[in-house]
Amino acid sequence: MESLIRTWLEQNLGPVERLERQARWRPVWFADVVRDGRTLELCVRGDRTDYPGVFPLEHEMLVQSLMHERGVPVAGVHGWIDEPRAFVIDRVPGQPDFAGCTEAQRDAVMDDYLRILAELHALDVAPFEAAGVRRGGVAAYERWYRASKKRPDPFMEFCLGWLRRHPLDARGRESVVVWDSGQFHHDGQRVTAVLDLELAHIGDPLMDLAAFRMRDTIIGYGDFRRMYAKYEELSGRPVDAEAVAHHHFAFTLTNQLAFHAALADPPPGSDYMTNLQWCNETNLFAVEALADFLGVPLEAPELPAAAEPSAAAVPTRHLVESLRSGDYELRRLFRLARHLQRFDEIGRACVEADLDDLAVLLGRRPRTWQEGDAALEEFVVADDGAHDKDLVPLFHRRLWRAHQLMGPAGSAMTTHHRLQDVG
């Protein structure tokens, strides 16, 4: 694969000084190429391995090119590689978070980012549409989920049913959006480039004010009330808090919709634990959003005590310790081993607790978790919202247990981050 990339770079741009794959879940390479006596610092973005994306890779390149042509600070595009499917862009300077920054620096950067969003949202969508930029939203994710679904997924069916029963009126709002907002590099004062445009499309501009609420739990963007007021000032348009909340809920579903199939049947190269962590964390955000909509209090269930060590406890512990490493590939396996170790300790009891909850709801106790998932999905599809206030706490308990099975108690993998209150 790298030899094909090297050949394309040499034939189209110049001699390659360095080509190195980034250690991450998506195929990405960093390249240094000499052209006209200077070194081009490039990034080669490849296709996902675990799902094809709701928009094809060509769509990402198209939107990025159109934005760049209109002065939006995104990396310049150098071209498309047919094999492996990838496109070549500039590497951009700056840092992706606020480590080492003062509060004033962070706020200045965020004000600049909001300015960029406001200017993006003011662009005429007609040239983007004419060039082939799509409309989409969560419906694009649902289409992939329906086409690739491999097993019952009662929580997703519950959430999608809620969205169908409570459609959002965008009141004519439409613009080019990045959707997966909050991803950029900065120099401590200004944004140097907006990054990761794989979800960019034509949609409601308020999608961009909602999506990065989840990433805020990791990055820390500052006070959202202040930022929303700043966006209103910069754009001249009011921020509809109810619409933002609706878009936030819809965006919390995108991980599970995207990775349902990859978690049910992981393809080679899939980062199972990263996908599982993303899904478990954002599923909790989703059920918490529903609880806010419905005014339902949530309480995390008590976890069962660890069972007596099984026959697998010693070899599992040995496996975990053998995989403890900073190497990316070993780290993936280390996390998977710790998940299996924790399941060996309390997994069976968590499954039994889930089935006990279903017995109360259904009036009968399913025999297995598979039977339970199928019965619960059948119930929520037929229920059509009649028992939403009963189902939200039930799903919260199930999702909380699933989240806590990802690793040892208190580990980073089992830590659930709370969203900032923007009400």
Mark where each language-model region is.
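An alpha-helical support segment within catalytic cores of ATP-dependent transferases
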Residues: 2-12, 16, 125-189, 236-238
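Short, surface-exposed acidic
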Residues: 15-19, 237-245, 369
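ATP-binding pocket architecture of kinase catalytic cores
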Residues: 18-134, 143-155
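Active-site acidic catalytic loop and adjacent metal/ATP-binding pocket
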Residues: 24-33, 38-39, 43, 77, ...
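Active-site activation/catalytic loop segments of kinase-like enzymes and analogous catalytic loops
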Residues: 206-239, 249-295
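Short amphipathic alpha-helical segments and their helix-coil junctions
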Residues: 227-239, 309-324
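Charged, amphipathic alpha-helical linkers/stalks
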Residues: 291-317
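C-terminal amphipathic alpha-helical interaction region
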Residues: 321, 325-331, 335, 342-423
